[in-house]
Amino acid sequence: MILISHRGNILGRKKQLENNPDYIENALKLGYDVEIDVWSVDKQFYLGHDEPQYKIERSFLQNKKLWCHAKNIEAFYRMIDDKIHCFFHDKDRVALTSKGYFWSAFEDEMTSKSICVMPPSSRDLPKDIAGVCSDNIGYYK
C-alpha cells in the first residue's frame, strides 16, 4: 500500500510547517510519498496551501514520490506539460491523477486504484485500495 504524507505531516498536523520544502524532504527521507500543494505564478512554481509561499524549482516536483495538488489551473497545465504527477480539483469528491489514480474522500466508493484521503483512523481503511493519504501516516506503517 502507498503511504502518503499529507503536506509533510507524519504524526499529526503541524500547520506552520505544511508544504515547507524541508518538511517535505524529511517525510521523503523517512520513506513516505508526500502530497503537496503547488501554485504557478508568472511561470514560477511555489508551494503553499492557501497561497504561494515557498518558491521551488521544477526539478523539486519531478520526484516520483510526490503527489502534486495543483492549486491553480496554470500550475496544473504546467505540471501536465512537464509530466509531473499531479491532480486538480476544487469541490469534486474524486479527482483523477495524471498517473491514473483516484484521489478519493474517505466516504466515497473505492477501487484498487483509489487513494483514500484523510480517513478518520487507521483501523477504518477500505479493503483493496492503492494507498492512503493522512496527516497521521506514521500510524499506518
What residue spans do the PLM features occupy?
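Phosphate-group recognition and catalysis centered on beta-loop-alpha active-site segments
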Residues: 1-141
